[in-house]
């Protein structure tokens, strides 16, 4: 037992479970819904194997059941399976709806992250373009003026025309936003904005959760947002 290799990550544990219980777990493709209480079955069946601890098993199960491919497999009429692939009852409507919401929130988070990354790339490209478009101006050599001979009359200096100062164009005022410092002070139905890079999208508070605030965008999409991305 002491010479068994140790699995260091949840992905390695999932790969081991897919090999150990191929009729229950899968390493790729759509996953089958698991039996309720399967954690205890795993503890009983793989206790001591690969130096696995309960904490590792619990973390691997959490990662497996929150993956997109597992959530895609939670559909009405689908049957749960045990470690040997035996049917253990159909999914109820509550579990199907919960999985659907989790999948929508995960997609919304990815979309928001991509939008923020694209905004940063556009800002960096714009800053680089401004530097390239403004090369240093070369100084022209000053023309040499012949020295005035002694006794020669001085010519009156031509007066320079008075140049009018160019009118300063006022830059448009940037919209100022106040960050949300305490999400507990928010109320359901309250209007606020969600920051995505340099932009702020209008949203409405749907629910205040322990992970953040669930909001609905004007597009109809709902997602959970952390306090640092919320402003008034």
Curated annotation (Swiss-Prot):
Extent of the signal sequence: none
Compartment(s): Cytoplasm
GO molecular function: RNA strand annealing activity; RNA strand-exchange activity
Keyword list, A-Z: Chaperone, Cytoplasm, RNA-binding
SMART domains cross-referenced by the UniProt entry: ProQ (SM00945)
Family matches, as Pfam families: ProQ, ProQ_C
Chief subcellular location: cytoplasm
Record-level GO cellular component terms: cytosol
Residue pairs linked by disulfide bridges in the UniProt entry: none
Region span, Disordered: 105-182
Gene Ontology biological process terms, A to Z: post-transcriptional regulation of gene expression
Compositionally biased spans, kind Basic and acidic residues: 117-136, 147-177
Compositional bias per record (Basic residues), positions renumbered to this chain: 137-146
Family, similarity comment: Belongs to the ProQ family.
Role description: RNA chaperone with significant RNA binding, RNA strand exchange and RNA duplexing activities. May regulate ProP activity through an RNA-based, post-transcriptional mechanism.
Protein name per UniProt: RNA chaperone ProQ
């Amino acid at each position: 037992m002491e010479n068994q290799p140790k699995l260091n990550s949840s992905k390695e544990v999932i790969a081991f479970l897919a090999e150990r219980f191929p009729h229950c777990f899968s390493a790729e493709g759509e996953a089958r819904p698991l039996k309720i209480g399967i954690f205890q079955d795993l503890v009983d069946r793989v206790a001591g194997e690969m130096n696995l601890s309960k904490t590792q098993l619990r973390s691997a199960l959490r990662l497996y059941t929150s993956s997109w491919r597992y959530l895609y497999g939670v559909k009405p009429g689908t049957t749960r399976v045990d470690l040997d692939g035996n049917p253990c009852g159909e999914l109820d409507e509550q579990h199907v709806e919960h999985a659907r919401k989790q999948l929508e929130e995960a997609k919304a988070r990815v979309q928001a992250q991509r939008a923020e990354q694209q905004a940063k790339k556009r800002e960096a490209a714009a800053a680089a373009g401004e530097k390239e478009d403004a090369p240093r101006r070369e100084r022209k050599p000053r023309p040499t003026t012949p020295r005035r001979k002694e006794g020669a009359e001085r010519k009156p200096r031509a007066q320079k025309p008075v140049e009018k100062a160019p009118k300063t164009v006022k830059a448009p005022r940037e919209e100022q936003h106040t960050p949300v410092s305490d999400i507990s002070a928010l109320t359901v139905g309250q209007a606020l904005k969600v920051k995505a890079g340099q932009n702020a999208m209008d949203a409405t508070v749907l629910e205040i959760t322990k992970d953040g605030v669930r909001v609905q965008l004007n597009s109809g999409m709902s997602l959970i947002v952390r306090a640092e991305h919320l402003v008034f």
